[in-house]
Amino acid sequence: MRFTIVIPVALCVLLIGLTAPAQRKKGYARKPKPLPVVSAIDTEALKGLITQPRERPLLVNFWATFCDPCRDEFPDLVKIDKDYRPQSIEFVTVSLDDFGEIKTSVPQFLVSMKATMPAYLLNVTDPEPAINFIDRRWQGDLPATYLYNEKGEVVYKHIGRVNTAELREAIEKVVKKSD
């Protein structure tokens, strides 16, 4: 009686084991995609990133994985990135997550959003100097979106979930001025 159960089970295990390598060769077993690189950035490097001379406007979005409005607006920002970055603007994101998230939840979130824009994580013990550099009136609320013209001047800012139509309008205006 035992053999009538053991033999069919053993045959099934053997067949599954023999077909697994064939499935891998056919591309059925996928390798996990590598996570995007999220670069650490400190206050001085952030200042340099924003103030460096550039040929195109710069869009910067400050966000965090623990921020619901940030997560909600991210698909819209990814669409804006795809529509404008290749030819019109530079676009970077700066996460204010804990530095320990640089290789885990931050890149995993970016993959889930299909984000391709350069990504940074603010690596400071005190974010106040970075926040004050960006905007003395900004209290650090997230998300925060800033659009800079080629001269490094803020031409659009929004604290909270961005209105996509307003942001697109601001991008169109600054791009037309730079042409």
Question: What feature does the model see in each segment?
Answer:
Residues F62-K79:
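Conserved redox-active cysteine motifs that mediate thiol-disulfide chemistry
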Residues P8-I16:
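Bacterial N-terminal signal peptides
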Residues D141-D179:
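Thiol-/selenol-based redox modules, centered on thioredoxin-like
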Residues Q108-L142:
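Short, internal strand/loop/helix patches
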Residues R56-L58, W63-F66, D98, D141:
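Short pre-active-site segment immediately N-terminal to redox-active cysteine/selenocysteine motifs
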Residues L18-A40, T51, Q108-V111:
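N-proximal helix/coil linker or "cap" segments that precede and/or mark the start of modular domains
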Residues V37-L58, D81:
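A short beta-strand-turn-helix
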Residues S88-K103, A115-T125:
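Thiol-based oxidoreductase modules, predominantly thioredoxin-like and allied folds used
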